[in-house]
């Protein structure tokens, strides 16, 4: 079953495949009355959609908030948190959660940060592979203001992206930062105004989608391993993935296309 089919089954997630670029799925979070606050339903439906990606021909996922919601994700659903006790929270925290599913998706995930990405929204962009922000976006981990801490990986992924100092400041103060500062500290990769925002997001998506899907998956795995293994283990892992590519037709197609001065045809491999 493709993403086109399953997208109609959900109330809080919309999926558009190939509407902007062939091989690219735009996954829109859509809880307009709550600015995409992450409740159990939204987390579950987003996880289900991302789980389907490897079963399709999609090569890149663009994750974003629906335009009429006014946000990427404005945080967790505080009403839901208020009613939850410790036992219920432990159950809700069982892995793999949506953050791990995005992190582990074989296909690259681009976070199109079209508005505020707070709390769980900030953690969703941290789990993504490339982060492109609208110049008006605000980003932060304000959980400390509610007497809690980030619970979706923020205390672990954020320091790996921006360093311990910036992560401490953001998490301990709960202050929001603008897109420009987020880029300066390494939390987002690029910032664009309204005129160039979508153009750049889908330019990057198209560039990635044109590459070998097998090489993309292996490259993502190897890069992710850099923060999870010691250097020697990581180098050995990279070498093994590199060698495995020599057992695929993708290596042959890519090199043949280079010498024949043509675009590779990955679908025919």
Feature roles, as predicted:
Residues 31-32, 211, 261:
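Short loop-to-helix capping motifs
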Residues 1-26, 175-208, 217-226, 254, ...:
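Amphipathic alpha-helical segments at domain termini/boundaries
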Residues 22-30, 41-86, 101-111, 130, ...:
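A structural preference for short, pocket-lining loop segments at secondary-structure junctions
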